[in-house]
Amino acid sequence: MKEPRPMSTKTPRRLVIGISGASGTIYGVRMLEILKKTDIETHLVMSKSAEMTLVYETSYKPKDVRALASVNHPAADIGASISSGSFATMGMIVVPCSIRTMSEIATGVTSSLVSRAADVVLKEKRRLVLAIRETPLHVGHLRTLTTLAEIGAVVAPIVPAFYNKPKSVDDIINHTVGRLLDLLGIETKLVKRWEGGPAED
């Protein structure tokens, strides 16, 4: 009698992308555009607010963005695959991440699939990156961010870099997206790596 074949423990090349209603939806769009060229299976969930912000800030329509993902999940579908810990993924990134979404994730009191999927990633000890897009922050926000860091999330505010001497808004977006993907162990050609500056006298 043959022994049962052991289950594979290899994590699928599968990533959850959450887009909330904060300003900066273009970062989420660009990330999907980049990942579409890779072997990574992307699972997208956009909040209703994200769809509104997208139309206001960019020339994209929600259907254009959904076409970039491997799989789409309605924000109200709390029974989706990504709402279960048994659905293995590399992790999740919420980009941009609104203060409301951040707060729901920190408390575990979730109202949509964006925050529910993030909560699942945390409880399963997978990588969760939150690209916060808000300023200024009051003490309550900062305490919530501290809680998120303590429970395992990577708090990565969207902050542009200038050491790479960007020549356009696209350069800034691409570099930021590349750095966010770095946090998930995904290598791209988007980041100009710092190799040290001139020595001081």
Outline where the language-model segments fall.
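A cross-family phosphate/adenosyl-ligand binding-site feature
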Residues: 2-129, 135-201
